[in-house]
Amino acid sequence: FDLDGGVLQWRDDAVKPAADMLVSALRVQTRGLSWPVRAPMPFEGSAQLDQTVIGIRGTATDTAAQAELSLGDIPLGRFAPYISSALKPALAGKLNAGGRLEWQAAQGDRPMALQLLSARVDVNELKLGPPRQPLASLKRLLVEDLRVDLVQRSADMGNLTLTQPQMRVQREADGAWMFEPWLVAAPNPAAPATPQPWRVGLAALQLTE
């Protein structure tokens, strides 16, 4: 199976402003297709989001899959409709990432498993607010050996490196911190929801100049 030159249009009206993205140059290649599945099927795919290259390569069956993912440099402004639901000031910077995704279907008493392993997230020239006088900035944010369990809702970082973090910390006379006006107030849900909270772990933190 070989798909070449595909186009995918993504629009999300649930956020304001609406998110509108165009994925082009979509290519998917697979070998050894069969049903029932007799052996892991190798696959490979690539696409472009604006000028950003997205890649995936792995193997899959009807009950399990694993894939190496890669995301080239992409401006954070591309995700502004989603970021603005949590932060009022604009967030600028460039993100690239990679990692291994593993999935296993539920079988018997064993629940479904979906994990991102050995992941790396690299954000450069991070600025919050006006570009010339940002409210906060970071030359580089690097997360290494990131492990995310999407079913168990946990994230463990092997190493977090922050390069040249800059932010003025201030508390107002009324006791409010300077960052409180930056945050968008969460809407009151119609009915209280109690999802399992996320657990986040960090093995090592480095601050560098």
Question: Could you say what each language-model-derived stretch is?
Answer:
Residues 1-85, 91, 98, 112, ...:
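Elongated, acidic membrane-bridging lipid-handling scaffolds
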Residues 9, 128, 149, 167-168:
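Extracellular beta-strand scaffolds
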Residues 84, 127-129, 133, 137, ...:
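A cross-kingdom feature marking solvent-exposed beta-strand/loop segments within repeated
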Residues 108-110:
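Single-stranded nucleic-acid-binding OB-fold domains
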Residues 118-121, 125-127:
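Surface-exposed extracellular loop regions of Gram-negative outer-membrane beta-barrel proteins
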